[in-house]
Curated annotation (Swiss-Prot):
Membrane spanning residue stretches: none
GO biological process: defense response to virus; regulation of defense response to virus; siRNA processing
Enzyme Commission number(s): 3.1.26.-, 3.6.4.-
Protein name as catalogued: Dicer-like protein 2
Ranges where the Helicase C-terminal domain occurs: 367-544
Residues annotated to bind ATP: M36, D37, T38, G39, S40, G41, K42, T43
Binding site for Mg(2+): E1129, D1260, E1263
Organism: Aspergillus terreus (strain NIH 2624 / FGSC A1156)
Site feature: Important for activity: K1256
Length: 1377
């Protein structure tokens, strides 16, 4: 058959051609025998039919693939497993000892859950004969090399003994479908033979008709060349070498009485007749073996010459000795027979030593000389050839001879191939030089180019997948027409040669037969060429296609003449994918009059509703049919919404934008930050006074607690507790009680509060505060209003230090010490220092300076501080001795005084709370935030240096917005392919749009950008705020966009997805939150689905068609009803982000935004997802049969074999299969390292994953399955998280967070260590052989410090270079220390 075509191998595309699809579709209508030339890709037809049978027809039935040889069975099974890796399949051949499986239980166990079996015809015929396999079990029978189904061949026995009787008795539903594959349906020249094969197989022989011209373009006819030689007369007594003549003489004069079998009969008294027969016929085991050996030796001399026969004889004797030493190779021979043969042949071998290899010793036969002469005329640079010989011995010796002959050894890399069956027969023990092991890698080496010439028996005529050859030589004439056609088909490279060696002694009639065959072949070529020329001439006919379509709104016109170009333009801008051809496919169908109608099939990323469009009319020329079909296709694309009103694709066009947002500069003028104190200033004119208690605590110590009061002219918002950092070890906590309305506050109380507020503001400062006391917010002790006056009299003002000393005031109740010589600098009292100066006591004070830092909202790393409490030790190093006469001491105790330092921080946070409250009551009223805490964080720009800023919430909001928009576009635009969805999302979530949204709703006024600077801070006054006019401020448009995302993130943190969606709707009204509704459930989802896979996913699909779509690669174009996974992968990407972000947001470890970004980047890294895809396996039971020698029988062995997730992906690209195998090989080498890093490593395995360099489809199917689960579950993220948990991603996330795994990319680490001086340059380089690799150079200060070469990707090169750089930088740092 059935090899894959060379063009397919070159292009790497499994995508079926039109003529292959024609044959596949024909096979669905009736039983057919596909007759196409060797190399035309009949395998594709079989693969399509197998897939269709498993998906849509009778998936519970068994598919049996029959091939004539064991080698071909293994090859076809390999093709099936590579292209349909999820299908459970196996081979059954003589190597499995199936002839000894004599129990039904063995067969039942072997075939249990099996979907495809590949075997020789004899295996199935014998199994059916013994009743182990029944016709009713089979859904499809595929006959490779179907021309064998004749006479008593096992293929015909299957049909005649089982298929046809069942068909007659039970009808067509009781028998399997039949698909035959052949390049030569006629074996002989009998005209009735084709009809006989069709009758035997109950099938019609078909060849492509509608797309025959395409078939001809993919098949190449070789030039037939005759090579003449004069044969050797072996009967001439002088002919032959001394060794050959000695062998012939020895055998002819052999004394049969020495034969072990005759000796055995002589010793027996019951075998007289047997002895008589043996002596008369001379047929014993040993003598018959020697006879065949002599015949082969003579044949080799005649065919190849003297050196060849000497080599054959000596090599055979050496091989015999090896077999005797290895008793396992001669189980059927007793020791006496072995010794007899060895002794007989060894005596002959003494005549002459091994044949020499000097040039003059190579005396070829005339036939070999003709062959070598022909080979010498071939082109060395492109040579790839096959030589067919009849006998196995000839094959082995000829390959050896060409490998050592002076004229050929340097030009050809030879190997022999005789197949994998027959070599173990006991009658061939002498003279059988080629073992299975010796030819195991022959074909693969030929495909790879390591060998360029194979000498083979007719085993390579049929089916075996070998590369297209430039030369095919028949060393012996083909036995029949079938062999002639099959061998000729091997020479399918362009300008190839098919040569046959002819003896000058051939009779004229024999020669005439081949001349007639050649003439018939040439006539067939000429007939095909004539038809092709007629078709080309027909295309010159003028046929007018008048179709026209106009878009009224724009005047854009579509005509048949422009449609083809528009269609190709549409396909060209679809997202490019590896292994995928986005060009539209054109096919034709014909009516009874020879007219045709075109059909265009678009790439699988296009919605199935418009993927296939058929022309509406029949045409004489292909050109006209093409135009009209393209016109209908473009018109449907427009009606489906994939072309705009200008009849252009939507990508990068305004149609993907829901609104035109216009551009914004990077820095824009926006409203000044909203000032809530202005509203409070006006409120004092008619106050509704509210008051809140402030409870101050130090280090959580209940012994130090201060109660204060905050008063305002209107309702006070709920304030969150505040943490103020006095120093590195002392922390104040401020808690705010719920505000209470205070009715009828007298004016003197207000004045007392203003005076007390001024007292607190002045207390810790050396500067005099302003005389104005009309503060918008008032502070005082937590006392009844009636006691405020007395409190003020008691605590206001100061005393001289000497007066305080004389009253012996206790230290804890003392106030701030002020040094009048230094502008009333406030000091912290430590102790009195009294000295004697004569009779006069000199009183001095030991004091400490107050801490210089005033921004207590920010945590700082400071030395141990001082707080005036009994628990705080002294610090002599900071002591200052000051004369008491130069100081005053405030009456307000220091424990109250420090509250004055808290007022600026309290009002800063109160201002932020008031702004957030106003925002929640106006713009974000519908969101219904539970508190202002999240909102304050969301509107605080990093430049404000507030206790919290929006960066963390912006990270959350970015993922929530991306996720929400992805869901909206996916649901709203089922007609959009993934490229449109991606670009549509980018248009909505771009910073420009988000910044415009912030301006549209007035969000700019609520963004906190002013930095809190306590040293420059002044208490807000009514008189000033009442006259202020709001201005403008410059602000980055990115900050506007970030705040939009951070508010979405805040809503998400406050109330989950529902509240986040409400916030999105308010800020971005064009985004409609669509419910996630899966498509209607189809009756059956066409896919080879494994029940274990469904269970292992952790989710039961309501609509399995979604899972099928999730597993359909874009290269899979044969299934016109299923879209490729790209749309689901687009959605799954957003879902994965959301699952990861949700896990981080709700984890006990709270990470900063920068670290979360790195973690998310690491977790959603395509190589990591690909690794998890390769590790995600489904256990499947596999049963095999083991021989039990002791019991003389067989035992069934069952084991669980893993089936990886990637095996279920549907693809039609040969290059993809090859790339997949390469990646899996790297996976096997890197797996242990990556697994260890994921479970135990302190660092993320960047280098190992970059070396894995997995193709994107591995990670794509993880995301597409996640998208399918999300849609099928109607948007249930918890269910999606379960799948992410099962593949191993969430457990690794938890380990990263818990163990603080370093996920920073090595390049960033290198940049950090080098302080940004490391310059990385990665380039793709191509060597002299055309092999590409990546090279990375790292320079520091213009000096190369690292060079990495030979990498598979730029990522691998950069990671390796970065790690090397890190090692150098750290080593240098250690050396400097």
């Amino acid at each position: 058959m059935a090899s894959l075509s060379d063009q397919d191998l070159e292009m790497g595309l499994f995508c079926p051609r039109n003529y292959q699809t024609e044959m596949f579709e024909a096979s669905l209508q009736e039983n057919i025998i596909v007759a196409m030339d060797t190399g035309s890709g009949k395998t594709h037809v079989a693969l399509l039919r197998i897939m269709n049978e498993l998906e849509t027809r009778r998936p519970q039935k068994l598919i049996w693939f029959l091939a004539p040889t064991v080698a071909l069975c293994f090859q076809q099974h390999d093709v099936i497993t590579k292209n349909l890796p999820a299908v459970k399949s196996r081979t059954l051949t003589g190597q499995d000892k199936v002839e000894l499986w004599t129990e039904q239980a063995i067969w039942d166990a072997i075939l249990k859950d099996m979907q495809v079996v590949v075997s020789t015809h004899a295996v199935l015929a014998d199994a059916m004969s013994n009743g182990f396999v029944r016709v009713s079990q089979l859904g499809l029978l595929i006959f490779d090399e179907a021309h064998h189904c004749m006479r008593r061949h096992p293929a015909n026995r299957i049909m005649q003994d089982f298929y046809h009787p069942t068909l007659v008795k039970q009808g067509p539903d009781a028998v399997p479908g039949i698909l035959g594959l052949t390049a030569s349906p006629v074996v002989r020249t009998n005209s009735q033979e084709l009809s006989m094969i069709e009758s035997n197989m109950n099938a019609i022989c078909k060849t492509p008709r509608a797309h025959r011209q395409e078939l001809l373009t993919h098949t190449h006819r070789p030039h037939l060349q005759q090579i003449w030689y004069t044969p050797v007369n072996i009967d001439d007594p002088t002919s032959g070498t001394r060794t050959l003549r000695a062998l012939i003489h020895a055998w002819e004069t052999i004394d049969l009485e020495d034969d072990p079998y005759v000796k055995q009969l002589r010793r027996s008294t019951f075998d007289g007749k047997a002895l008589q027969k043996a002596l008369l016929t001379r047929k014993t085991y040993c003598n018959e073996s020697l006879r065949r050996f002599v015949e082969r030796s003579c044949h080799i001399f005649q065919e190849l010459g003297g050196w060849a026969v000497d080599y054959f004889i000596h090599a055979s004797i050496r091989r015999l000795r090896e077999k005797i030493d290895d008793s396992a190779l001669m189980l059927d021979w007793d020791n006496e027979e072995k010794e007899y043969l060895a002794s007989f042949l060894s005596n002959i071998a003494t005549i002459q030593s091994d044949p020499p290899r000097r040039p003059e010793d190579f005396i070829p036969s005339p036939k070999l000389e003709a062959l070598i002469s022909f080979l010498s005329s071939t082109d060395d640079s492109t040579f790839s050839g096959l030589i067919f010989a009849k006998q196995r011995a000839t094959v082995t010796v000829l390959a050896t001879l060409l490998s050592v002959h002076p004229l050929t050894k340097d030009r050809f890399r030879c190997a022999a191939f005789v197949g994998w069956s027959g070599g173990g027969n006991r009658k061939d023990l002498i003279g059988e030089l080629l073992s299975m092991q010796m030819q195991r890698d022959t074909l693969s080496e030929f495909r790879s180019g390591q060998k360029n010439l194979i000498v083979a028996t007719d085993v390579l005529e049929e089916g075996i997948d070998i590369s297209a050859c430039s030369v095919v030589i028949c060393y012996d004439k083909p036995a029949n027409v079938k062999s002639f056609v099959q061998r000729r088909g091997r020479a399918r490279r362009k300008e190839s040669t098919f040569a046959i060696l002819f003896s000058t002694d051939d009779e004229l009639c024999d020669l005439r037969k081949w001349q007639l065959l050649e003439e018939a072949m040439i006539e067939a070529y000429q007939d095909d060429e004539r038809k092709r020329c007629e078709a080309l001439a027909l295309e010159t006919m003028a046929e007018v296609v008048t179709e026209r379509f106009e878009v009224e709104s724009t005047g854009a016109v579509l005509t048949a003449d422009t449609a083809v170009a528009r269609l190709h333009h549409f396909c060209s801008i679809l997202p490019q994918q590896p292994y995928v051809d986005n060009r539209p496919e054109l096919s034709f169908e014909y009516d009874g009059t020879g007219r045709r109608r075109g059909t265009f099939k678009l790439p699988s990323c296009v919605h199935p509703d418009v993927r296939r469009t058929r022309g509406e009319k029949w045409w004489t020329t292909e050109r006209a049919a093409t135009k009209e079909a393209a016109f209908q296709t473009c018109k449907r694309l427009y009606e489906f919404g994939l072309l705009n009103d200008h009849l252009l694709p939507l990508t990068r066009k305004p149609e993907l934008r829901l609104t035109d947002f216009g551009g914004l500069p990077s820095i824009i003028e926006v409203a000044e930050q909203y000032d809530p104190w202005t509203d409070w200033a006006y409120s004092w004119s008619s106050p509704d006074i509210h008051q809140s208690r402030i409870r101050v605590q130090l280090n959580g110590n209940p012994e130090y607690q201060l109660s204060m009061s905050l008063m305002g002219p209107t309702v006070l918002p709920a304030l969150d507790a505040m943490t103020l950092f006095w120093d590195s070890q002392n922390i104040f906590t401020l808690a705010f009680d719920a505000a209470q309305r205070v009715p009828l506050v007298p004016g003197d109380v207000i004045e007392h509060m203003r005076a007390i507020t001024a007292l607190y503001l002045q207390a810790p400062s050396s500067r005099s505060i302003r005389e104005e006391r009309d503060y918008v917010a008032l502070f005082g002790p937590d006392l009844p209003h009636t006691e405020l006056g007395a409190w003020l009299l008691k605590n206001g003002g100061n005393d001289t230090a000497l007066d305080v000393y004389s009253r012996q005031v206790a230290s804890p109740t003392m106030g701030i010490v002020r040094d009048r010589t230094r502008y009333d600098e406030p000091l912290l009292f430590k102790k009195w220092v009294v000295t004697e100066d004569g009779d006069v006591a000199v009183v001095e004070m030991e004091c400490h300076s107050l801490p210089k830092r005033r921004n207590l909202l920010q945590r700082q790393t400071l030395a141990q501080g001082e707080i005036v409490t009994t628990a705080v030790d002294t610090a002599p190093a900071k002591a200052r001795i000051i004369p008491a006469t130069a100081c005053t001491i405030d009456r307000l105790p220091f424990t109250d005084t420090i509250f004055g330092l808290f007022i600026s921080a309290i009002l800063d946070r109160l201002e932020a709370t008031l702004i957030a409250t106003r925002l929640c009551e106006t713009i974000l009223q519908d969101v219904q935030f539970s508190s202002t805490r999240h909102v304050i964080t969301a509107i605080s720009a990093p430049t404000a240096q507030s206790p919290t800023d929006y960066q963390r919430y912006e990270f959350f909001g970015d993922s929530v917005l991306k996720f929400t928009v992805s869901c909206q576009l996916y649901m709203q635009h089922p007609n959009w392919p993934e490229g449109y969805l991606s670009e549509g999302r980018d248009e909505i979530v771009q910073n420009n749009r988000l910044a415009r949204a912030a301006l549209d709703v007035g969000l700019d006024a609520f963004i906190l950008t002013r930095r809190f600077t306590p040293r420059k801070w002044t208490a807000p006054l009514i008189s000033e705020k009442a006259v202020e006019v709001a201005g403008k401020r410059p602000l980055s448009s990115k900050v506007l966009a970030d705040v939009v995302e951070s508010l979405i993130g805040a809503a998400y943190m406050d109330g989950g997805q529902a509240k986040a969606h409400t916030c999105i709707r308010r800020l971005l009204p064009e985004i409609e939150i669509c419910p996630i509704t899966p498509p209607p459930v189809h009756e059956s989802a066409p896919h080879v689905m494994n029940d274990s896979l469904k269970q292992h996913l952790g989710y039961t699909f309501v609509n399995e068609a979604l899972l099928v779509e999730a597993l359909t690669h874009p290269s899979c174009r044969s299934d016109a009803s299923t879209q490729s996974y790209q749309r689901l992968e687009f959605l799954g990407d957003a879902v994965l982000d959301m699952v990861v972000v949700h896990a981080m947001a709700h984890h006990a470890v709270e990470c900063p935004q920068g670290e979360m970004t790195m973690i998310k980047h690491a977790l959603t890294n395509a190589n990591l997802l690909a690794f998890f895809c390769m590790e995600f396996v489904v256990a499947q039971e596999h049963t095999d049969v083991d021989a039990v020698p002791a019991a003389g029988g067989f035992a069934l062995r069952s084991e669980q074999k893993p089936i990886e997730l990637w095996r279920f992906m549907r693809s039609e690209a040969l290059d993809l299969n090859n790339a997949r195998e390469t990646v899996l090989h790297r996976h096997s080498q890197l797996r242990a390292e990556i697994v260890h890093a994921l479970h135990h490593g302190a660092q993320y395995p960047w280098q190992a994953l970059s070396q894995l360099n997995a193709d994107k489809f591995f990670s794509d199917i993880v995301e597409s399955i996640l998208g399918a689960i999300f849609v099928d579950s109607r948007g249930d993220l918890d269910v999606c998280a379960m799948f992410v948990e099962r593949i191993g991603l969430l457990p690794y996330l938890r380990r990263i967070l818990a163990d603080r795994v370093d996920v920073m990319h090595p390049r960033h680490t290198a940049q950090r260590l080098s302080k940004g001086e490391a310059l990385f340059t990665a380039k793709r380089v191509v060597d002299g052989s055309g092999n590409a690799s990546y090279r990375c150079v790292v320079k520091r200060n213009k000096e190369e410090i690292v060079v990495v070469e030979g990498c598979l990707s730029s990522e691998e090169a950069e990671v390796k270079a970065a790690n090397a750089t890190i090692g150098i930088l750290r080593a240098n740092a250690v050396n400097l220390v």
